[in-house]
Structures are given as structure tokens and as C-alpha cells.
């Protein structure tokens, strides 16, 4: 019995080296390999870095270089600048505070003479207690709280103009349907032009405008009705650029109008109104009101 047990132990000792040699030939498991790679001094390779995994390229940034980019500029509404000759600007400083408080309630967008606007006002006698009017801005005038703008449209063949007070509490909304400029700072001569130049659909849809672009300038020149006109628009003091005078006046009439020219006024530096310092002070007031 003892001899058989001794022979069994010797056989087991002989099988030990054979098992160790067979284990060395087996492939290393994945868990063991990951522990080896994640050892000290090595980073563990996981995720999309493994070979055979697709990595999408970064999204390209497309820059439109077809047109000039608009510079980042701040728009200061012209009614903020006080008229020339005021030595004590206290009145306009107090008015600017009221104007800034009003702008916190009503959004007054950027617009120019020549832009098409839609204005919604409170009207106790209209259906829905509100009324709308759409038209082209032909004039901006006034300073401070007295700033006004005139909209013109032709309705059923009749020219209609409405003068709105910019800071009137009855105004509920001012929408810019089409933002653009014209060749002149005043378009009052549209009263004497053909009706087609001041006719717009009351249900006109807003035209999208990219904020990075410059405000476009409409180079349109209108055709006038036969004389008489409300004013002598051909005279140099009006400096009108948006009228086709060659279609309504003769050469003799144009020469006669040039007799009223005053070419020396172009070189009169005292007529220039430098508002750079005033604009800087006004912008400081605007920034202070925003932070308060």
C-alpha cells in the first residue's frame, strides 16, 4: 500500500513541468494584456484610439468672403445729439435719461431715411384698440424727446403721410420691414414724384438683413411729375441726388438754377459741427444706464 502511494506522488511530480510548459504556450488573455499596458509609466489605450475605429474629421468653418464684412460699430440715434449752440446742456441731459428709460420698455430699432417701417400704435377707436401703418421714412427731425419721423405710403391712389413722435407712449411697436439708405438725407421730394415710388403693400413681409453687412444704399433716382412742384428741388441749396432732372428740365432751366449756387459754403469750416466729444459723453451715459 505504501509503495503504491509513493509511485503516485512521483507521477504527480512529473506532470508539474509539463503543465507549466503547456501554460506558456497559451495566448495571454485580454484582461491581463490591459493590466500590462496600464502599468506604471504607460497610458491605458481605450476608446476611439484603438486601431480600426473611425474618427470623424472636425467640422470646417466656412467664411463668406464674397462681400466686405461690416465693422463692429455702435449706432447712435441722431436725436441724442443736442443742437448746436447750446451752452447749458442740462435740459437735453435730463431728456436723455427719460429717453433711455423709454427705450427699456419700447425697442426702437436702427433705421434711416429710406427705410420701410411698420408702426403699431394704440387707437381707442379702432378694432382691437390698435392700428398699423406701413410706409417709407422720408424725414427724421427733432432733438431729444421731440424727435419725430414721417412715414409715407400711397393708398388707393392718394398719398398718405403720418408724422410719429419717436418717444410717444402710444407707440407699441416699431418694426423695420426693410433696412436701407437713400442718396439723400430727406425724401420730401417724393411728394412731387410719381406715386409708384411711394407705394408699398401694407402686408409686406420683413426682408432679412445680415447683421454683419453694411447697411445697403439704394441708388434709385425717381421720376418727377410735371411742374409746378412744392419746392424748387433743382436749386443747389437742396443738394438733391435722387431725382432724374434730365427727364423733367431743360438745359436752360438747369443753368438758371445754378445761378443760386453758393460754392464758398463748402469751404466754411465754421459750419461744421464736431460731435465726437459729445458722442463720447453720451455713450458713457448709455453704458451707465445699462449697468444701473
Swiss-Prot record:
Protein name (Swiss-Prot/TrEMBL): Large ribosomal subunit protein bL19m
Gene: MRPL19
Family: Belongs to the bacterial ribosomal protein bL19 family.
Subunit architecture: Component of the mitochondrial ribosome large subunit (39S) which comprises a 16S rRNA and about 50 distinct proteins.
Pfam families (alphabetical): Ribosomal_L19 (PF01245)
GO terms for cellular component: mitochondrial inner membrane; mitochondrial large ribosomal subunit
Species assigned in the record: Bos taurus (Bovine)
Chief site of localization: mitochondrion
Recorded superkingdom: Eukaryota
Subcellular location(s) per record: Mitochondrion
Signal peptide annotation: none
Taxonomic lineage of the native organism: Eukaryota, Metazoa, Chordata, Craniata, Vertebrata
Amino acid at each position: 500500500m505504501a509503495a503504491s502511494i509513493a509511485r503516485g506522488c512521483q507521477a504527480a511530480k512529473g506532470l508539474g513541468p509539463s503543465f507549466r510548459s503547456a501554460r506558456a504556450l497559451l495566448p495571454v488573455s485580454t484582461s491581463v494584456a490591459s493590466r500590462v499596458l496600464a502599468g506604471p509609466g504607460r497610458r491605458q489605450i481605450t476608446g476611439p484610439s484603438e486601431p480600426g475605429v473611425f474618427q470623424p474629421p472636425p467640422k470646417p468653418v466656412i467664411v463668406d468672403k464674397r462681400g466686405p464684412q461690416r465693422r463692429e460699430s455702435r449706432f447712435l440715434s441722431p436725436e441724442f445729439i443736442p443742437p448746436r449752440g447750446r451752452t447749458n446742456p442740462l435740459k437735453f441731459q435730463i431728456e436723455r435719461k427719460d429717453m433711455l428709460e423709454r427705450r427699456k420698455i419700447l425697442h426702437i430699432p436702427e433705421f434711416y431715411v429710406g427705410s420701410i417701417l411698420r408702426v403699431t400704435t394704440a387707437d381707442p377707436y379702432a378694432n382691437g384698440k390698435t392700428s398699423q401703418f406701413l410706409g417709407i421714412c422720408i424725414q427724421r427731425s427733432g432733438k431729444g424727446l421731440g424727435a419725430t419721423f414721417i412715414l409715407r405710403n400711397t393708398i388707393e391712389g392718394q398719398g398718405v403721410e403720418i408724422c410719429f413722435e419717436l418717444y410717444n407712449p402710444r407707440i407699441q411697436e416699431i418694426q423695420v420691414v426693410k433696412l436701407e439708405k437713400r442718396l439723400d438725407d430727406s425724401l420730401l421730394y417724393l411728394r412731387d414724384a410719381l406715386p409708384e415710388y411711394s407705394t408699398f403693400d401694407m402686408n409686406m413681409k420683413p426682408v432679412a438683413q445680415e447683421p454683419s453687412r453694411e447697411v445697403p444704399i439704394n441708388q434709385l433716382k425717381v421720376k418727377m411729375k410735371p411742374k409746378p412742384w412744392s419746392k424748387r428741388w433743382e436749386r443747389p441749396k437742396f443738394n438733391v441726388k435722387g431725382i432724374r432732372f434730365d427727364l423733367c428740365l431743360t438745359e436752360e432751366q438747369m443753368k438758371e438754377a445754378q445761378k443760386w449756387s453758393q460754392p464758398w459754403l463748402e469751404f466754411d469750416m465754421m459750419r461744421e459741427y464736431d460731435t465726437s466729444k459729445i458722442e463720447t459723453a453720451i455713450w458713457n451715459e448709455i453704458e451707465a444706464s445699462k449697468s444701473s
